[in-house]
């Protein structure tokens, strides 16, 4: 096998491989000889089939197998001999010729690929980060405990008009220009006035109603509403009030805690505190991680593989356009041209790829590994995020090993960050919750999870639709 480098520019490589016809002929003869004693053909005694007859019957199929074996094995061995790590799977171009299958021509093919850049890892001691730590006010815990226990609150039927805080039972039918729309109807819907469960203007118009009332209200869907066909549109809802309930006094005690599955109020407060600490701790870590990545970004500047950059940019660009589409907005609405947005996200893609390569190199150098238990935990966390679909999600991961492997990269990255935190200077700083939550320029485009379909009148509670919410009843 003759191996010739035909291109070596930057990270790009092209290798020409020629397997002489005589080498192919030798491999074919070996396979035919091996088959001769095993094949059973009518008219011939075992082991007595003439070579010419075997070649006529099996020659081309055997040669095709030989060529496939070469294509499978050669790239790996060539890259190993050259001590190169390809950024992506090499592209193989084959010189197709019928004579090759007949063993009368050399087998020529080429490899085209980009190599990963050689990265010299620098010292980390100069990196300094501020770790913001916020004490959790007791009032935050009190408020969250009240929210958790609000689901245990009892309501009593009332005769008078509804007030904010009351619960009403209603039937409703939504219409656009007089025509009912999908997801815009429900029967026996329970709505607590003032909960902001529905879109702005809906609940407010139900203050003052009584059981038996029928009314039509007009509302406008928010411009950034998740359902694009409803965003910014005026709608009317025909509403029938079936009952009005006043809230009973909310009891904050051990008995209430037991109703939500905990043995005591103290245990509930402990769980709530842990959840809030986890939430703020995650925010603290993200800010620290951002500082580390900024420092690494300033320390490293090297050529990156165009193939990786193209994939990263396309992923970002697809998500950006999907987000705009869901919000019913355009680049002009965001105050930027599409061309300018492309430039900005191209820079972001470069940063992501470069930092990914740096973190990967650091991890390999210091021996960071992701074990099977960590992968299993990541799978279970994914499953947990889709209540009611646990079996389907678990089956997906069982049948799709590459999906499990995709969870390895973020775990690996976080373990590298853990390593770096032990090497750099970290200064803790006490801050208020408001200071901790203060927004800063995002480096990464947030990951979005697929969302289940929801009722058209339910207000979107966050910038990203949660996949955990249950689907609404259909009209």
From Swiss-Prot:
Pfam families, alphabetized: FKBP_C, Trigger_C, Trigger_N
InterPro entries: PPIase_dom_sf (IPR046357), PPIase_FKBP_dom (IPR001179), Trig_fac (IPR005215), Trigger_fac_C (IPR008880), Trigger_fac_C_sf (IPR037041), Trigger_fac_ribosome-bd_bac (IPR008881), Trigger_fac_ribosome-bd_sf (IPR036611), Trigger_fact/SurA_dom_sf (IPR027304)
Reactions mediated catalytically: [protein]-peptidylproline (omega=180) = [protein]-peptidylproline (omega=0)
Record carries keyword Cytoplasm: yes
GO BP terms: 'de novo' cotranslational protein folding; cell division; chaperone-mediated protein folding; protein transport; protein unfolding
Annotated localization: Cytoplasm
UniProt keyword annotations, A-Z: Cell cycle, Cell division, Chaperone, Cytoplasm, Isomerase, Rotamase
Molecular function terms, GO-annotated: peptidyl-prolyl cis-trans isomerase activity; protein folding chaperone; ribosome binding
Domain PPIase FKBP-type positions: 165-250
Origin superkingdom: Bacteria
HAMAP family assigned to the protein according to its UniProt record, in alphabetical order: Trigger_factor_Tig
Entry protein name: Trigger factor
Species of origin: Bartonella tribocorum (strain CIP 105476 / IBS 506)
Lineage: Bacteria, Pseudomonadati, Pseudomonadota, Alphaproteobacteria, Hyphomicrobiales
């Amino acid at each position: 096998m003759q191996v010739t480098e035909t291109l070596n520019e930057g990270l790009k490589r092209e290798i020409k491989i020629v397997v002489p016809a005589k080498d192919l002929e030798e491999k074919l003869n070996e396979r035919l000889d091996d088959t001769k004693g095993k094949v059973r053909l009518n008219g011939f005694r075992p082991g007595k089939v003439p070579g010419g007859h075997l070649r006529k019957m099996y020659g081309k199929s055997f040669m095709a197998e030989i060529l496939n074996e070469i294509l499978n094995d050669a790239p790996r061995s060539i890259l190993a001999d050259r001590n190169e790590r390809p950024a992506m799977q090499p592209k193989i171009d084959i010189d197709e010729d019928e004579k090759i299958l007949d063993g009368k021509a050399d087998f020529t093919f080429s490899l085209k690929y980009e190599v990963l850049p050689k990265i010299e890892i620098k010292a980390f001691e100069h990196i300094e980060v501020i770790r913001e730590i916020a004490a959790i006010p007791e009032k935050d815990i009190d408020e969250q405990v009240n929210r958790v226990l609000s689901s245990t609150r009892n309501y009593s039927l009332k005769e008078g008009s509804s007030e904010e805080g009351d619960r009403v039972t209603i039937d409703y039918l939504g219409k656009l220009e007089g025509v009912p729309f999908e997801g815009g109807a429900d029967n026996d819907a329970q709505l607590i006035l003032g909960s902001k469960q529905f879109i702005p203007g809906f609940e407010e118009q139900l203050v003052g109603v009584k059981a038996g009332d029928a009314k039509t209200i007009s509302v406008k869907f928010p411009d950034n509403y998740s359902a694009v066909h409803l965003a910014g549109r005026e709608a009317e809802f025909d509403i029938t009030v079936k009952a009005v309930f006043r809230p009973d006094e909310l009891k904050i005690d051990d008995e209430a805690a037991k109703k939500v599955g905990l043995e005591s109020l103290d245990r509930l407060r402990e769980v709530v505190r842990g959840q809030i600490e986890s939430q703020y701790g995650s925010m603290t870590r993200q800010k620290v991680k951002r500082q580390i990545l900024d420092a690494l970004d300033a320390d490293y500047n090297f050529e990156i593989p165009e193939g990786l950059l193209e994939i990263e940019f396309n992923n970002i660009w697809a998500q950006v356009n999907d987000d705009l589409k869901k919000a019913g907005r355009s680049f002009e609405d965001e105050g930027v041209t599409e061309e300018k947005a492309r430039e900005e996200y191209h820079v972001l893609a470069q940063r992501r790829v470069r930092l990914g390569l740096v973190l990967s190199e650091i991890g390999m150098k210091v021996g960071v590994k992701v074990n099977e238990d960590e992968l299993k935990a990541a799978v279970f966390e994914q499953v947990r995020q889709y209540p009611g679909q646990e079996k389907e999600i678990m089956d997906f991961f069982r049948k799709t090993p590459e999906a499990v492997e995709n969870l390895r990269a973020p775990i690996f990255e976080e373990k590298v960050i853990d390593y770096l935190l032990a090497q750099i200077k970290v200064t803790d700083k006490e801050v208020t919750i408001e200071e901790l939550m203060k927004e800063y320029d995002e480096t990464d485009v947030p990951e979005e999870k697929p969302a289940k379909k929801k009722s058209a009148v339910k207000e979107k509670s966050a910038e990203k639709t949660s996949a955990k919410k249950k689907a609404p009843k259909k009209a």
